[in-house]
C-alpha cells in the first residue's frame, strides 16, 4: 500500500508552480531561475515539425525575456493543474493559456520537481503549444 502524500508537500508544490507563473508574468528572471535546479532542462515539442527542442535554463529564460521585450505582456495563465507526489518527487501537469500581446496560445506544461534542502525545485519542464 502506498502512503498518502503529505498535504503540506502538495501545497508547497502548487505554491512553487504559482510562483513560477507569477515570476514569468512580471519578468522576474532571478525569481524564476531560483525555482529551477541549476541543471534543469526545458523541452519544447514542436507539433508542426514533429520534433523536440531541448533548451538549457538560460536559453529558456532568454526566450521569456525576448517575449517580454517584444510584447507589452507575456503571461502564462494556469488553468487546470494535476499534481502527483511520490515521496521526494512531484509531477505536475498544467494546462495553460499563454498571452503575448493580442495573441493567445493554449498548451500543457509537464513539470518534474524534486524536494531539495527543504524546498521543491523544478528539475525538468516539457511543454507544447
Write out the residue ranges for each language-model feature.
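Short, low-complexity N-terminal intrinsically disordered segments enriched in polar/charged residues
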Residues: 1-38, 54, 58
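Surface-exposed, charged secondary-structure patches
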Residues: 41-46, 51-103
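Short beta-strand edge/turn micro-motifs at domain boundaries
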Residues: 91, 106-129
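Short, hydrophobic secondary-structure boundary micro-motifs
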Residues: 33, 43-45, 123
Amino acid at each position: 500500500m502506498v502512503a498518502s502524500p503529505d498535504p503540506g508537500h502538495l501545497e508547497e508544490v502548487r505554491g512553487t508552480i504559482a510562483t513560477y507563473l507569477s515570476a514569468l508574468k512580471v519578468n522576474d528572471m532571478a525569481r524564476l531561475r531560483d525555482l529551477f535546479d541549476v541543471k534543469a532542462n526545458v523541452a519544447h515539442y514542436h507539433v508542426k515539425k514533429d520534433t523536440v527542442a531541448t533548451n538549457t535554463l538560460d536559453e529558456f529564460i532568454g526566450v521569456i525575456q525576448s517575449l517580454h521585450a517584444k510584447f507589452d505582456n507575456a503571461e502564462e495563465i494556469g488553468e487546470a493543474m494535476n499534481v502527483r507526489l511520490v515521496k521526494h518527487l512531484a509531477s505536475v501537469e498544467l494546462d495553460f493559456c499563454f498571452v503575448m500581446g493580442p495573441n493567445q496560445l493554449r498548451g500543457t506544461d509537464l513539470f518534474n520537481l524534486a524536494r531539495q534542502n527543504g524546498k521543491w525545485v523544478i528539475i525538468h519542464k516539457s511543454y507544447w503549444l
